[in-house]
């Protein structure tokens, strides 16, 4: 199985980009980024090849007997849909990646109030590499199948100057805090509740294939305890919240 890559923070991307530029004698680049709401569920995927549909978690293949929050059972009822998706992509071997979200999977977020559903955010073809969500063909698609695509709601845009990423970090922080306050995906289905954050990938289709350039920004409620520094009172004032999150992003 092809695992979906882990996504780190912006600070890791800054380090990689600067190191690459310095080694090759290049100026630090300016890269346009597109952000999609990060869904707090469990990472999942479906590989379609040789007429088979193999569900997977981030770490292993799944079966109804060895499931992960019922995802394999869900896929067993959607086999024809996933096969059709692969046919529309003219792919002999393709894995659709997404987040399995909904009731009972995670707690304390807006989307936990929804019935369980699969939200696709990427695909992988061994020949073509990673495929962006907007390039996944969905002719005659119906959301009644409880299979969605991450671009069904608006995305976010930011330009990152890797010579001076602070202005971009400020913008990312504002977007992230807004998502945390009210999850846009929960709002789509008339539910209230907090969101987790945003996943950022290069807007350029070719750069987007490089997973080392992807990063995520999480709201304060989803930061690890050790990231909430003792000198910052997280729940006092908006100003302190923003500064704390900017610090964690950079």
Language-model features and meaning:
Residues 1-250:
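Core nucleotide-handling region used for phosphoryl-transfer chemistry
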